[in-house]
Design a protein with these regions (language model features):
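Positively charged, small/polar-rich N-terminal and surface patches that mediate targeting and assembly
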Residues: 1-103
Length: 103
C-alpha cells in the first residue's frame, strides 16, 4: 500500500525563519527534509509592510516546502500554529502525484 504524499507550502515573514525552521527540526516523530528559500511578495497586501518594502514595491518573505505523508500535514500545521500564531503565515496543500530521484 502506497503512502499519499502532499506538498505543504508556507509563506512567512523572513524574521520568523529561525523559529520556524527550529520548530520543524525539533518535531517528533521527525519530518522528512524540507526546503526554504527567500522570496519577494508582490501585489496586494501591503498594509503591514515596512516603509522600505513599500518603497521597493515588494515584501520580503520566506518560502518553505515540505513533501510529507498526508497524515502528517495537520500535525505540522498544529505545531507551527502553537509556536508561531502569526496572521502573516500563509499555507496551502497540493497533491504530489509522483516523487523520486533521477539516479
Amino acid at each position: 500500500m502506497s503512502t499519499t504524499l502532499k506538498r505543504l507550502t508556507m509563506i512567512a515573514p523572513r524574521e520568523e525563519e529561525d523559529v520556524l525552521v527550529a520548530t520543524l527540526l525539533e518535531m517528533q516523530p521527525s519530518l522528512p527534509g524540507f526546503t526554504t528559500m527567500p522570496v519577494a511578495g508582490h501585489g496586494e497586501g501591503f498594509a503591514k509592510a515596512s516603509v522600505h518594502e513599500c518603497v521597493r514595491g515588494r515584501i520580503d518573505r520566506l518560502l518553505l516546502w515540505l513533501v510529507l505523508p498526508q497524515d502528517d500535514v495537520q500535525r505540522v500545521l498544529t505545531v507551527i500554529g502553537q509556536h508561531l500564531p502569526h496572521s502573516q503565515i500563509v499555507w496551502w496543500i497540493e497533491p504530489v502525484d509522483a516523487m523520486g530521484r533521477l539516479a
